[in-house]
Amino acid sequence: LGSTFGLWLGPRGGYTAATPRFAKKIEKGGNGYLNSDSMDICVGSEKYLQNLEKFLTDTCTEFDIQYLKLDGFCLKPCTNPKHDHITGGENDMYFVTEMWQRWIDLFTRLRESRAKDNKPLWINMTCYVNPSPWWLQYVNSVWLQNSMDIGFAKNLEQQAQVDAEITYRDSMYYDFMCTRALQFPAKNIYNHEPIYGNTAKVEYTDEEFEKFLFWNACRGQAFNELYLSYNKMNSAKWRILARMLRWQKANHHILKNAMLLGGDPAENNIYA
């Protein structure tokens, strides 16, 4: 198939009730600290990042991992002066500055390690990251930050579920690109699409599934995570997916320059 492994890892310890317990176990084991301001792992800790870097480097080498989804960074700055990081400054910027510098160093050394083996590495940063193009020196994609994993617009009554989902995501793009005017290339956006899974509670005909996939491809992103439940797929949907991926790859040199024109989709405006 020509495929390789990827790794989905939450630096802060995930997003569940177990997150504080993970952080406490890491602190008890001497491998990092609990950030009591956000009740998760302190992602600015020097010892934690040293241990994490070793784990990621060793794991990427052993399993030839070429994709890293690093999901969840700093929800709140850690203000504990007893930890192995600095604190203070306006809006806790001393901590924030040192924390991100340590992450930049981690990204740099991790890429150098993979380069020695002539291996590529796609790094995807998700939650609690400023979506600045500056990050693209070190990572490949950044999550939108302004949306839910999945959502449905309520701009029209009794509209098809697929249209509500498409409009929701497009309205988040409008907010990102137009309202907030974030100067971020479409090709490097991670948008959570396509989602067609059991927990999403969506049900599309083959025609709707095709519309959903190709519409998403036209947003211009270079990277898709396929959140698909196999039991919801039939032979036609698998063929549609394959056709979309081939088309998206063949036309990426055009699609990567996608721009949003028109008004806010959630306000029933014409757009493209």
Predicted segments — roles?
Residues 53-86:
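Active-site groove signature of glycoside hydrolases
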Residues 231-239:
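Contiguous C-terminal substrate-recognition/catalytic subdomains in enzyme active sites
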Residues 5-9, 68-70, 123-125, 223-226:
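Hydrophobic faces of well-ordered beta-strands that scaffold small-molecule active sites
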Residues 1, 84-99:
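Glycine-rich tight-turn/loop motif centered on a GG-T
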Residues 1, 59-60, 216:
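Generic structural signal for hydrophobic
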Residues 261-272:
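Carbohydrate-binding surface patches
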Residues 14-50, 54, 100-232:
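Glycan-recognition surfaces
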